[in-house]
Amino acid sequence: MAPSFVSIDTTPDFDMTPTSSKSADSGKRTLLLAPPSIATQEDKLRTLFTTYDRSTTDLQMLDRVSAGFVSLPANTYDLVLVLTGTDGTRRSEALQLLKREVYAAVVPAMKGGAKLQTEDNFFGEAEDREAVLAGLVKKETGFEKMDVGNGAAVPLRLGRKKKAAPAPAPVVQPPPIISSDDNDLNDDELIDEDTLLSADDLKRPIVPPPECQPKAGKRRRACKDCTCGLAAQIEAEDRERREAADKSLNVMKLESDDLNELDFTVQGKTGSCGNCALGDAFRCDGCPFIGLPAFKPGQEVQILNDVAQL
C-alpha cells in the first residue's frame, strides 16, 4: 500500500474580492477568527470584507485553528479580531472554541504590541486566564502582546571595587619599665590614720546602721565586708565571753596531784589528815566521807541510789 501524505493548508479559507473596502495601512495585517457557523452565511461574509481590506486581512476558522489544521506565520499580525458579532450573537460559539490551543497558535503569529480583541469587546473569566497564561497583557478593550523584539542587550559596566590598601601593622610599643627609683616618695607624704580621729571621736559609741540591726528572734550578725564596726564589736563581746568561761573553768580545775590526794581508792594514797578511812570520829569537818562507815584505805566505794556501797 502506497504511503499517504498529509499536507497543511496555509491559505485563507475564503478568497473573495471585496466590492469596496476601507483604506488600510499596507504595513499592518489583521487576522479574523470566525466561528464555523459564519461559513454558511454568505451575506455576513460579504459585509465582513467590505469592512476589512482583503489584501491585508486573513480569515481563519476557530475550529480549524484549534484542531491544528492551520499554520500561522510568526510575527505577522498587528490585530487579531474574534468575530463574536457586534451585538454578541456569536459570542457563545466563538468563546467556546477560544481555548488554549488557539492561543498557542495565535500568540506567536502576533507582532510585538499587537492586540487581541472581540467585536463586542467581551472576554470571559476563562478566556482572560488563558490569555494571561499565553503571555498577553490585559488592556481596556482586550489583550496586547508586549513588544520585546526591539530590546537590546546592554552590558552593565560595573566599576570594579578598588582594593583597599592593607592597613599598616600597628607599631608595638615596649611596655614601660617601672623603677622604684622613679617614685620619689617620702614618709612625710604618708598620713597616719590614727591622727584623723580625735579623742572625742574614739569615745563615741559605735552605732550600727538600721540594716545591720538583728531581726526579731535572730542572732545579730555582721556583714562580710563590715565597715561600721559591728563585726569588731561582736568579736570583742565573744572574746569576753570566752575569757569569762575560761576563768570559771579554772576555778574548779584540779591538778593530777590534787586528784590523787582526794582519791582514796588509790592504793597507798591517803588524805591530808590521814584519818578519812577511820570513821567520822577521826575525819575533818570538810571531809567528803562524812557519814560513811570506816573502810580500808584503797577499798572501792560506790554510790548507788545515793547510798554508799562498800
UniProtKB/Swiss-Prot annotation:
Subcellular location(s) per record: Cytoplasm; Mitochondrion intermembrane space
Q: Where is this region: Disordered?
A: 1-30, 165-184
Tell me the Pfam families matching this sequence: CIAPIN1, DRE2_N
Query: Does the UniProt entry include the keyword Mitochondrion?
Result: yes
Task: Show where the record puts the motif Cx2C motif 1.
Answer: 273-276
Q: What is known of its domains?
A: The C-terminal domain binds 2 Fe-S clusters but is otherwise mostly in an intrinsically disordered conformation. The N-terminal domain has structural similarity with S-adenosyl-L-methionine-dependent methyltransferases, but does not bind S-adenosyl-L-methionine. It is required for correct assembly of the 2 Fe-S clusters.
Protein's name according to its UniProt entry: Fe-S cluster assembly protein dre2
